[in-house]
A protein has these predicted regions:
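Acidic, His- and aromatic-enriched active-site or binding-groove loops in soluble protein domains
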Residues: 2, 6, 21, 59, ...
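Active-site-adjacent loop/helix surface patches within enzyme catalytic domains
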Residues: 2-156
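Intrinsically disordered, low-complexity regions enriched for glutamine and histidine
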Residues: 30, 159, 177-180
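Short, electropositive, low-hydrophobicity segments enriched in small/polar residues
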Residues: 100, 164, 177
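Acidic/histidine-rich, metal-coordinating catalytic segments
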Residues: 153-168
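Aromatic-lined carbohydrate-binding surfaces of glycoside hydrolases
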Residues: 171
Length: 191
């Protein structure tokens, strides 16, 4: 997978979202789940006033289809109030990947997919809950995109939203293989 000189991922479908500002330095890759149905439904939501500026650079559907919404040199509203390795407000210095996944909403997961649910406790605390599983095709696509981004932009870390905003976010959650993704990108262990 290659990234073009104008910061687009070759081979990805494009659905341009307006907005954002120039991002001169990219330091981190942040992985999220959409808390929703399909990748397209999330993109459609981001186009509404109710989204309040929420967006991400990449959305990956359960079948592994990759959609890019903004070039990687433009900010997106994916991190919100966040902090990591001395940086605050990570929208200004991170690339966001959203994975179509219901997270810990088992009713939504059962309505949109027949994927298994994992019963687990989140690493940041809370009760044992049911989490939607991530399909192999989606994990593989995420890994390919992440490796290309880390290589192209020499990113400092790959983290979950749950790592940069632990008191308010729980994505991508315990069913996502974060350690495997990080190791594929050249980082050791968990964030």
């Amino acid at each position: 997978m290659n990234i073009t000189a104008d910061h687009w991922l070759e081979g990805a479908n494009r659905q341009l979202l307006s907005g954002g500002s120039t991002m001169n330095v990219r330091r981190f890759l942040v992985i999220h789940f959409t808390s929703g149905a399909s990748a397209q439904s999330s993109i459609n939501f981001w186009k509404t006033p109710a989204a309040k500026g929420a967006s991400a650079h990449i959305v990956i559907d359960r079948d592994g289809a990759v959609i890019q919404c903004r070039p990687f040199n433009v900010t997106c509203g994916h991190a919100g109030v966040s902090k990591w390795k001395g940086f605050e407000g990570l929208n200004s210095c991170s690339i966001g990947i959203e994975l179509a996944n219901a997270g810990n909403d088992p009713k939504l997961a059962r309505r949109w997919t027949k994927l298994p649910l994992l019963k687990a406790k989140h690493k940041n605390g809370g009760p044992v809950e049911e989490w939607e599983a991530y399909p192999d095709a989606q994990i593989k696509a995420c890994e390919e995109v992440a490796k290309a981004l880390v290589a192209r932009y020499k990113l400092d870390d790959v983290v979950g939203h749950e790592d940069i905003a632990p008191s308010r976010k729980n994505d991508p959650g315990p069913s996502f293989p974060m350690q495997k993704l990080r190791e594929a990108c050249g980082f050791k262990g968990l964030p």
